[in-house]
A protein has these predicted regions:
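Conserved Walker B catalytic segment
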Residues: 1-15
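Hydrophobic/aromatic beta-strand patches that form the interior of the parallel beta-sheet core
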Residues: 15, 49-51, 216, 264, ...
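Accessory nucleic acid-recognition modules appended to NTPase machines
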Residues: 103, 107-274, 278
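Conserved catalytic cores of phosphodiester-cleaving nucleases, focusing on short active-site segments
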Residues: 14, 255, 274-293, 312
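Active-site regions of enzymes building and remodeling cell-envelope glycoconjugates
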Residues: 50, 323-338
């Protein structure tokens, strides 16, 4: 199709959408047969620019959800607390986003109808479509193992130690049996991966542990539906067991959309962990996510107190403010955290 347009004399901009799963899988198969340098034969090299399409982030959701509130949101910067009326309104919008996630059809349905049942139905349909794609394109990767990994996200994140454990997939499961399935899901952008760093040391890429990581879902709303968490629990119960992982998934989703680079986490052992770590230039930014039961904050606070990093962030439901050695940033500002440093 692209070649037909490019071979003519008509000059126009063409926008095409797709998962590229067929291209990726086809390329992988040719690479095995023709060597690692094999390219998809039908790909119009040099004629297209690729853009990654993500679920709507919170700012995009807010723009559709409440245009007037979004206009105020766009003006927020610095570390001064927000007026309480705006803080409460933005928390309400954040709660709605945690329920819907950022899949456009789901967001549109919620804004038009505000029907939790319809939201859940649409999300289950999307989950089923993703699983159908896995069966369709899984091929030599073993679709069954890909599905096992994808369906394990909720129990994996529900563990006290959220690190991905192969043995939790099924009895006797080994890394070499499922590594390819995980790489397929990451490449297809169905899951998000955060690697552990063994030291808080620049550059983080040099201390990244390739065999220690957490897997999160593409979209927080789909993860919530997979976990069968009703909207009422999100609003009325601030401390149910899965609230923490759900909020972490939300924060990771927003951070990855900021373009600030790879998001990692730090863990010396299960009880000594910093939720996320960003490298901004040469600065290491420790991040605490306070979403549910507070299990790991001691490590974050100790690091901030002893190392005195230039930037340190705690995301929570509290208002924007400087709090000792770190900045408390409301969860609804995660997508624009850099404006608050």
């Amino acid at each position: 199709m692209f070649l037909k347009f490019s071979s003519g004399t008509v000059h126009m901009a063409i926008v095409a959408g797709g998962s590229l799963l067929g291209v990726k899988i086809g390329s992988a198969k040719r690479s095995r047969m023709e060597g690692d340098g094999a390219k998809p034969k039908s790909y119009p090299v040099g004629k297209v620019d690729l853009l990654d399409v993500e679920p709507m982030d919170f700012a995009e959701f807010l723009r559709a959800f409440d245009g007037a509130l979004f206009e105020y949101y766009e003006t927020i910067s610095g570390q001064e607390p927000l007026p309480d009326i705006f803080h409460r309104k933005l928390l309400d919008a954040y709660d709605a986003y945690l329920f819907t996630g950022g899949m456009p059809e789901v967001v549109d349905s919620y804004i038009r109808n505000c029907d939790p049942e319809e939201v859940g139905r649409l999300q289950r349909d999307l989950i089923a479509l993703y699983e159908d794609d896995i069966v369709k394109y899984g091929g030599e990767v073993n679709a069954g193992r890909v599905l096992v990994v994808l369906r394990s996200l909720v129990p994996q994140l529900s563990k006290e130690n959220e690190k991905f454990i192969y043995g939790a997939l099924r009895e006797g499961a080994r890394g070499r049996d499922y590594e390819e399935a995980i790489e397929w899901l990451v490449s297809a952008r169905m899951v998000r991966r955060a690697y552990n760093v063994k030291e808080m040391k620049f550059p983080l890429s040099a201390v990244e542990m390739q065999n220690a990581f957490k897997l999160y879902h593409l979209d927080v709303g789909l993860l919530r539906e997979l976990a069968a968490v009703p909207q009422s629990e999100l609003v009325l119960n601030s401390d149910f067991d899965f609230k923490g992982p759900l909020v972490e998934n939300y924060v990771l989703q927003q951070l990855q959309n900021t373009g600030q680079g790879e998001v990692r986490y730090f863990a010396e052992r299960a009880d000594r962990e910093i939720d996320f770590v960003l490298q901004v230039g040469a600065e290491l930014v420790p991040i605490e996510v306070k979403g549910g039961k507070d299990k790991k904050a001691a490590t974050f606070k100790t690091y901030v107190k002893t190392k005195k990093p230039k930037f340190a962030i705690r995301f929570s439901r509290m208002n924007l403010r400087k709090d000792g050695g770190f900045v408390n940033i409301p969860l609804y500002l995660a997508i624009k955290f850099d404006k608050c440093l």
